[in-house]
Amino acid sequence: MKLNTKQTRIHKHKRVRKKVQGTSSRPRLCVFRSNKHIYAQIIDDTQGITLVATSSVNLNNKESDNIRPNCDTSRVVGKQLAEQSMKEGIKNVVFDRGGKLYHGRVKALAEAAKEAGMGF
């Protein structure tokens, strides 16, 4: 039986999660992309806690005027996530693309986080 698009993405994400494990010294940067928003969080899998989280839903009011599901919004979220993680002392992470291709909004978020000082 053929899988639909959502089932295929979940299957890919499970396959990637078998290989990608976040630790206390190098937590996991998990990205989820929906049709309207993009969400990113840094997770320590050994303790099972979220250390830092941000999304396009909770951007500042001055930035929320231009919230559209595009690469510019993803860059703002990536930069904001990197700034928050630097305050927490997190510099190196393992990137988990959530079963999506490393292209478009996912790539824009990752590149913005790298430019802001995070290491993958």
Swiss-Prot record:
One example of the protein's molecular function in GO is: structural constituent of ribosome
Per the record, the major location class is: plastid
From the Swiss-Prot or TrEMBL record, state where the protein is found: Plastid, Chloroplast
Tell me which domain of life the UniProt entry assigns to the organism this sequence originates from: Eukaryota
Q: Which Gene3D superfamilies match?
A: 3.30.420.100
Q: Per the record, what is one GO cellular component? A: ribosome
Q: Which GO terms describe its biological process?
A: translation
Q: Which segments does the entry list as coiled coil?
A: none
Q: Which UniProt keywords apply?
A: Chloroplast, Plastid, Ribonucleoprotein, Ribosomal protein, RNA-binding, rRNA-binding
- Similarity field: Belongs to the universal ribosomal protein uL18 family.
Q: What does this protein do?
A: Binds 5S rRNA, forms part of the central protuberance of the 50S subunit.
- Which PANTHER family does this entry report, sorted A to Z? 39S RIBOSOMAL PROTEIN L18, MITOCHONDRIAL (PTHR12899), LARGE RIBOSOMAL SUBUNIT PROTEIN UL18M (PTHR12899:SF3)
How it assembles, according to the record, is: Part of the 50S ribosomal subunit; contacts the 5S rRNA.
- HAMAP family listed in its UniProt record: Ribosomal_uL18_B
Protein name in UniProt: Large ribosomal subunit protein uL18c
- This protein's species is Pyropia yezoensis (Susabi-nori)
